[in-house]
A protein has these predicted regions:
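ATP-binding N-terminal substructure of ATP-dependent carboxylate-amine bond-forming enzymes
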Residues: 1-124, 128-130, 134, 153-164, ...
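Active-site nucleotide/adenylate-binding loops and adjacent lid/helix of ATP-dependent enzymes
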Residues: 1-4, 8, 14-17, 83-88, ...
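ATP-dependent carboxylate activation and anion-phosphoryl transfer catalytic cores
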Residues: 12, 269-362
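Glycine-rich phosphate/pyrophosphate-binding beta-alpha loops
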Residues: 98-99, 186, 242-246, 312-326
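A glycine- and small-aliphatic-rich helix-loop capping segment at beta-alpha/alpha-beta transitions
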Residues: 109-118, 194-199, 329-332
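Short hydrophobic/aromatic-enriched beta-strand-loop microsegments
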Residues: 117-121, 146, 236
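Phosphate-binding site of ATP-dependent enzymes
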Residues: 190-278, 301-307
Length: 362
């Protein structure tokens, strides 16, 4: 759904857009009729939508490369045209991919090897922010307050579960949240109200990662999100508040339940809102982010305490998602936001290229 909204905005901004989808078995397909594909909402990407395509880890052969034999046999296209059998020129990539392989540094690493500019954070920042454990270690190093947690390794849990439970029970105050360290969209997250629910919650979390985090529920705190935009001098949007209709903001609440409320701007006084923006920018910089990120925090209006929960380097991006809605409330339209992100991709690529050239001359 994010891809459909971004595709429409890029076209309206005057960009020539090549649309690449990924099938469930991991094959990349150049979608030949994206207008038709996106017309009726979400659809599964299948190989029948277009020819197989590739991005090569070779800066001497940038762009999207297509298998000419596959074109000829499956789609009845004349492969005597060298443009079709070779590479299609690409100026920049907008990787609208959430979760594993999309915002964990994997696709970013491939794009770095290819030499193509791309929207969003680089390989290191993407991988750091995807792993909540690593991100919190870095944020704490810089003195940025985070939600406290206990880490559980899957191999330890498999070898000695009783010992792990005994160690945990002495230091936990329920309710707690159990979550995979490196997963998105609240997949594998459980709210646990007592010791009897820990085993099931840990098993669910370990379906998505080899590390699980256990965090105390932040009762009395508001769930606040802040959108960050920029590279070296990032700006923060007005903060927004999430009021889920469910017990917590799980996968269904994010993507299915229409009763979840987004309050923009959040019900915070001006000083507290500015503090949220300041901490969000600090978190963005500390983890080395660029382009965009949504920083999720917990705020206690009475004590004025602020704790960073996590940083999302490729947040949801439909017209009604929190990230673009926060910028809309801050005075930037959806199309201007998308165009700005493309500009930031070129800016980051130019800065990285100059730094590389300076080093090679030494």
């Amino acid at each position: 759904m994010s891809a459909r909204s971004i595709f429409k905005a890029l076209v309206n901004c005057g960009f020539d857009v090549l649309t690449v989808g990924i099938t469930k078995d991991g094959r990349w397909t150049l979608i030949q009729n994206p207008d038709t594909f996106f017309a009726d909402g979400w659809k599964e990407v299948t190989q029948e939508l277009g020819p197989l395509c590739y991005i090569l880890p070779d800066p001497c052969r940038p762009g999207i490369w297509i298998d000419g034999h596959e074109l000829e046999e499956a789609h009845n296209i004349d492969c005597s045209n060298p443009v079709i059998t070779g590479g299609l020129d690409v100026d920049a990539v907008f990787p609208v991919l959430h979760g594993s392989f999309g915002e964990d540094g994997t696709i970013q690493g491939l794009l770095d090897l290819s030499g193509l500019p791309y929207v969003g954070s680089g390989t290191l920042a993407s991988s750091v922010c995807m792993d909540k454990d690593t991100a919190k270690i870095i944020l704490s190093h810089y003195g940025i307050p985070c939600v406290p947690y206990v880490r559980v390794e899957r191999y330890e849990w498999r070898q000695k579960p009783i010992q792990v439970l005994e160690d945990l029970s002495s230091g936990l105050t329920f309710p707690v949240f159990v979550k995979p360290s490196g997963s998105g969209s609240s997949l594998g997250v459980s709210k646990v109200k007592g010791e009897e629910g820990l085993c099931r919650a840990l098993e669910d979390a370990f379906l998505y990662d080899t590390k699980a985090l256990i965090e105390p529920a932040q009762e009395g705190y508001l769930e606040i999100e802040c959108a960050i935009l920029g590279n070296n001098e990032p700006k923060a949007s007005v903060p927004g508040q999430i009021v889920p209709s469910r017990e917590f903001y799980d996968y269904e609440a994010k993507y299915i339940d229409e009763n979840t409320r987004l309050i923009i701007p959040a019900a915070l006084d001006d000083d507290l809102a500015e503090s949220v923006k300041k901490i969000s920018i600090e978190a963005f910089k500390a983890t080395g982010c660029s382009g965009l990120a949504r920083v999720d925090v917990f705020v206690n209006p009475r004590s004025r305490d602020i704790k960073v929960s996590e940083i999302n380097t490729m947040p949801g991006f439909t017209e009604v998602s929190m990230y673009p809605k926060l910028w809309e409330a801050s005075g930037m339209s959806y199309e201007d936001l998308v165009a700005t992100l493309v500009d930031l991709a070129f800016e980051r690529k130019t800065a990285c290229h100059r730094a590389f050239r300076r080093v090679t001359k030494m």
